[in-house]
């Protein structure tokens, strides 16, 4: 039998996710990146943050938060399936642009007392998007 989250549990989960994105956004801004879009969604995918690096590179950022390092921690939770969904959303987003800039895919992994920014965390080949 499937388990369903109560409205309160869902709201708490969404709040924690928004707070994690806020922390990631603040960190990336301190590193010189500028926000372009937050929570870009399309059918089949979503991107937590789209940022622009000082060199003009468009950076698609997946933000993951975990309460501990069990099961490999926050970074390990970005599975190939999740990577494919981010890549799909990125392709959709890029199709809206007149000119496609250089791009990369980063992960910001948050755990208690720790924030890791993993640049070039994955690409189309690693996610198996071409298969």
From Swiss-Prot:
Gene Ontology MF: a single term: nucleic acid binding
Parts forming coiled coils: none
Pfam family for this entry, one: UPF0102
InterPro entries: Restrct_endonuc-II-like (IPR011335), tRNA_endonuc-like_dom_sf (IPR011856), UPF0102_YraN-like (IPR003509)
Top-level taxon of the source organism: Bacteria
NCBIfam families: PRK12497.1-3, YraN family protein
UniProt record similarity statement: Belongs to the UPF0102 family.
Protein name (Swiss-Prot/TrEMBL): UPF0102 protein H16_A3579
């Amino acid at each position: 039998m499937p388990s369903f989250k109560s409205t309160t549990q869902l709201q708490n989960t969404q709040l924690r996710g928004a707070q994690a994105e806020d922390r990631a956004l603040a960190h990336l801004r301190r590193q010189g990146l500028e926000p372009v879009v937050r929570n870009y969604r399309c059918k089949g995918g979503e991107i937590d943050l789209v940022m622009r690096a000082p060199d003009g590179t468009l950076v698609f950022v997946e933000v993951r938060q975990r309460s501990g390092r069990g099961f490999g921690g926050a970074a390990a939770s970005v599975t190939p399936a999740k990577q494919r969904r981010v890549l799909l959303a990125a392709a959709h987003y890029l199709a809206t642009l007149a000119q496609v800039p250089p791009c990369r895919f980063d992960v910001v992994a948050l755990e208690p007392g720790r924030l890791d920014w993993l640049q070039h965390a994955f690409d189309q080949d690693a996610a198996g998007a071409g298969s």
